[in-house]
Amino acid sequence: MFCVVSLIMNLVIVESPAKAKTINKYLGGNYTVLASYGHIRDLPSKNGSVDPEDKFKMIWEVDSFSKKYLKEITDAAKKSEKIILATDPDREGEAIAWHVREYLDEKKLLKDKKIERVVFNEITKKAVTNGIDNPRNIETNLVDAYMARRALDYLVGFNISPILWTKLPGSKSAGRVQSVALRLLTEREHEIEQFKPVEFWSLNVNFKNAKGDILNSNIILLNNSKIEKFSFKNKEDI
């Protein structure tokens, strides 16, 4: 008695189901294209998800939304010879590719399998096939940038927001971007409030050339002295 196992030659993982459907048409029967539906893991909203005392070690957790789609990916990965990570060519896309690879590795599904990272900037047959033909490694600098962004989001937002709610009733939240932006806006508003207008005049001369064209010029030197912005504080100084 023989047992025949169906083998998917190549598994391609993208972010969105719409892209998966289109790319599947371009690649044909030797490929199965599945969507991760965005990020598959995140930092749980609890203390200790990022540990600054342990080189900012981060604890990742699969959310309930992603479990269904991860099961489809893991089931397909078991039957695949090659796994192609084709998420978006940006910081977040690189992070998703890294998370998928790490997750499959933790599940011990990468043994004896080839895993590749491919990117394409448009969803056309030419761009997709060119990307498939030119795989590369996961860009660790982009992954590191994502981790720094996510760790700061957690450390600033998760830890400081509750303090704001306690100390400043009515406060919404703190954040990696919004808190800095609010600081800049506040400082600028203070500068505007403290601004005292100062009168100054500039000296311009118009010349007419032989053709009758008017040429406007700013006088920058008068009596061998450079004219500064506040050299003429009122009309009488000119």
Please place each PLM-identified region on the residue numbering.
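Compact Cys/His-rich, Zn2+-coordinating modules
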Residues: 200-238
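Intrinsically disordered, low-complexity regulatory segments
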Residues: 4-150, 164, 220, 225-236
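Short acidic (Asp/Glu) and glycine-rich catalytic loops that position anionic groups and cofactors
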Residues: 109-111, 157-166, 182, 210-225
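Short flexible coil/turn linkers enriched for glycine and charged/polar residues
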Residues: 27, 79, 158, 197, ...
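Flexible glycine-/small-residue-rich
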Residues: 14-15, 35-37, 87, 156, ...
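Structured core elements
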Residues: 11-13, 84-86, 117, 176, ...
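C-terminal or mid-to-C-terminal helical accessory/interaction module adjacent to the motor/catalytic core
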Residues: 123-207
